[in-house]
Design a protein with these regions (language model features):
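Non-heme Fe(II)/2-oxoglutarate
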Residues: 2-90
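Internal catalytic-core helix/loop-beta-alpha segment
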Residues: 76-81, 86, 90-118
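Short beta-strand segments enriched in hydrophobic/aromatic residues
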Residues: 98-100, 127, 176
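A short beta-strand-loop-beta hairpin characteristic of the jelly-roll/cupin
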Residues: 105-110, 118-120, 126-145
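Short beta-strand His + acidic residue motifs that chelate non-heme Fe in jelly-roll/DSBH
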Residues: 109-111, 157-165
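A short hydrophobic beta-strand segment most commonly corresponding to one strand
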Residues: 123-125, 166-177
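Conserved metal-binding segment of the jelly-roll/cupin
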Residues: 142-158
Length: 177
């Protein structure tokens, strides 16, 4: 259970915003319960991103919005509340990533979500707390804490690092304007 604590914003860099307790506890618990449910549909992806895939890397994903089109209409109402809180005008992609625990922290590879877009932003909502993190190249490291959101411009190179202490690291990734 996530306590109903008021959100707080941390700025690790003028270009990166970190918001703890981004959603109220009720909405977050609904979202977390849906995504972590054993019957939630996951799809295997050989590799973590298209640019720099370390050998043996893989993840499971679930697309809610792909190429501006809603792909999971059943669960989209839970996601739309996050979009409203973010102030999204246009959705390009929303997907949830599940990275299994590894023996040591693995860098998933640096990448850009939308390098050619002037207006696209990235938001990552951490679904579970673990000892993994996101590194935003030249701007700092954001630890995986449940209900923490990090926002930055899509032209900023970033990489996810796996966890070693929990069964899985789960993040909800938004590309939006």
């Amino acid at each position: 259970m996530v306590p109903n604590i008021k959100s707080s914003t941390i700025t690790i860099d003028p270009k990166v915003q970190v918001i703890d307790n981004f959603l109220d506890s009720y909405r977050f618990e609904q979202l977390q319960s849906c995504i972590l449910d054993q019957n939630f549909d996951w799809y295997y992806l050989d590799g973590i991103n298209g640019d720099d895939n370390p050998r043996g890397s893989y993840q499971f994903t679930h697309g809610f919005v792909v190429n501006d089109s809603i792909k999971d209409s059943t669960n989209f109402p839970l996601i739309s509340s996050v979009c409203n809180s973010l102030g999204c005008n246009k959705l390009n992609r929303i997907k949830v990533n599940l990275n299994p625990r590894t023996i040591f922290h693995r860098n998933g590879g640096y990448h850009l979500d939308a390098p050619d877009s002037l207006f696209m932003k990235v938001a990552i909502l951490y679904i579970n707390t673990n000892n993994g993190w996101t590194n935003i190249k030249g701007h700092g490291k954001v630890k995986c804490v449940a209900n923490r959101l990090v926002k930055f411009h899509s032209s900023m190179s970033h990489a996810g690092y796996s966890c070693t202490d929990e069964k899985r690291k789960v993040v909800l990734n938004f590309n939006y304007e």
